[in-house]
Structure formats: C-alpha cells, structure tokens
Amino acid sequence: VSNLATAEAMIAAYNAQDVDAYVSYMTDDACEAGYRGDVVREGKEGTRSGLAAAFAKWPQNHAEIVDKQAVGDYVIFREHVTRGPASDGSELVEPFDVVAIYSFEGDKCSRVEFVR
C-alpha cells in the first residue's frame, strides 16, 4: 500500500469519525502539530483522545481532499474542512482550507503538520 493510499484511508477514517481506524495508520509516537510548530496531539493515544473530543464537539466535521501529491516519505493534501454546528453551542467555525503534510516512517504515518 502506498503512502498516498494510507493518507487517503486516514481521511476516510477521519470523515467517518472512526478514531481507532485513524490512529491504526500511525506510529505509536506519532503526533499532529502546527507546521514547524507546537504539537497539538501527542502520540497515538493523544491523537485518539484529541480527535474523539473534536468529533464530539463537531459531529458533522468533514475534510475534503482538494489536491494531493506524494513526494518521497511525505504526502501533501490541500483539504477543505467543514465543521458544522458545535454540540456545545459555541460559535460556528467557518469552513476553511488547510495544507496537511503527512510524514511517513515505513508504512505508518509518524507526524501530521497543518498549515493554516
């Protein structure tokens, strides 16, 4: 399976709000972070709990892959994200675009960085 196919499977799991499937594609010490910046979800378990909380807050959350390419051990997606209404009544988040850079070690994703 190619890194591109794995990253696409991660987005499919994300859109299904299946945190277990999403983190199954990650290394144990994987993380999600701002581009060249602070880690926002540390490790597979931190990613699992962080995404579960996000999905509980935004049950209609969805990411559409607008553009994609694979370069070496990296997959780069331009994603259009729609949150929908928040379950806690907080202010609506307008849809936004993000560039996501998936770094791979072997067949597992070790880091996802977001440029927004």
Region spans (language model):
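A beta-strand edge to alpha-helix "cap/lid" segment located at domain peripheries
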Residues: 5-6, 15, 45-116
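A short gly/proline-enriched turn/hairpin at secondary-structure junctions
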Residues: 31-42, 53-57
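Short, well-ordered alpha-helical segments enriched in acidic and aromatic residues
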Residues: 16-33
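Short helix-capping and inter-helix turn/linker motifs at the boundaries of alpha-helical repeat units
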Residues: 1-2
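Short, electropositive, low-hydrophobicity segments enriched in small/polar residues
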Residues: 21, 41, 47
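Generic hydrophobic alpha-helical segments
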Residues: 9-10
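Proline- and acidic/polar-enriched loop/turn elements at helix boundaries
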Residues: 26, 37, 114-116
